[in-house]
Design a protein with these regions (language model features):
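Juxtamembrane intracellular "pre-TM" segments in multi-pass secondary transporters
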Residues: 129-165
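Loop-to-transmembrane helix entry
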Residues: 1, 80-90, 110-113, 186-203
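Hydrophobic core of transmembrane alpha-helices in multi-pass small-molecule transporters
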Residues: 33, 45-66, 70, 168
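Helix-loop boundary and gating motifs at the non-cytosolic
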Residues: 1-3, 159-198
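Helix-to-loop junctions at the C-terminal end of transmembrane segments
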Residues: 5-18, 103-104, 207-218
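Symmetry-related core transmembrane helices of the 12-TM Major Facilitator Superfamily/SLC fold
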Residues: 31, 96, 111-128
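Residue-level signature of mid-helix packing/kink "hotspots" within the transmembrane helices
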Residues: 2-7, 93-94, 201-209
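C-terminal ends and interior cores of transmembrane alpha-helices
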Residues: 24, 28-43
Length: 218
């Protein structure tokens, strides 16, 4: 979901449909899988649960790139302003974790209803964002676009190659963080796991706000 969906959805947003409309549609579709998951879950139905989560992630993962695309399109100075805008996403992430723990929803279906409801509201909100037309609308889709040739060619630049390789390596432990940290913290006797996990997101805020200062040194 994290590797393939963003590429194909990005292709649609680049050539066919306004980015804010694609973004809104993805959040609404993603909310549906979360809202129906508790209705379908039950003993012996782990495959159904995993399918619903996969469908949600197929909708969610492309939104990370699409929100960045909209931001850089409309911010007057994206390099300096984007980290300040993006940090509010992390603050929202922390708020959600605190809410889940406050409601003691970690082990109940309520967490899925909260996720689905938030995704639904966010989807409708996206339609109020500034219009961001597809930059390549009307242009034919070429074979090199399907294999992301232009993106691969950027690997010739050493700085970009280092960035991509580093990002790839960082995402390996990050996947384990998402998948297993809650079980590990529960085994350690930590209660209110969702709230405890926000400590990691708090460090993200610090480094994100430092980014404009670091860019000045480049």
């Amino acid at each position: 979901a994290g590797m393939l969906a963003p590429f194909f959805i990005g292709l649609i947003a680049d050539r066919f449909i306004n980015t804010e409309k694609v973004l809104g549609g993805l959040f609404i579709l993603g909310s549906a899988s979360m809202l129906i998951l508790p209705q379908l879950a039950g003993p012996g139905k782990s495959s159904i649960v995993n399918t619903c989560i996969l469908l949600h992630m197929l909708c969610y993962m492309p939104t990370l790139a699409l929100t960045a695309s909209i931001s850089f399109k409309h911010l007057s100075d994206g390099v300096k302003q984007f980290p300040i805008v993006r940090v509010w996403g992390t603050i929202g992430w922390i708020a959600a974790g605190l809410l889940i723990s406050f409601l003691d929803a970690e082990k109940t279906a309520l967490q899925f209803y909260i996720a689905g409801g938030a995704s639904l509201l966010l989807g409708f909100f996206c339609f109020s964002l500034p219009k961001t037309p597809a930059p390549l609308k009307g242009e034919p889709v070429k074979f090199k676009d399907l294999i992301f040739w232009d993106a691969w060619s950027l690997m010739k630049k050493p700085s970009f190659a280092v960035f991509i390789i580093s990002s790839f390596l960082i995402c390996i432990p990050l996947a384990a963080y998402y998948a297993y940290l809650q079980n590990q913290m529960s085994a350690m006797g930590i209660t209110n796991v969702a709230a405890a996990k926000t400590l990691g997101q708090g460090s993200e805020i610090i480094f994100m706000l430092l980014m404009p200062l670091l860019f000045r040194k480049l």
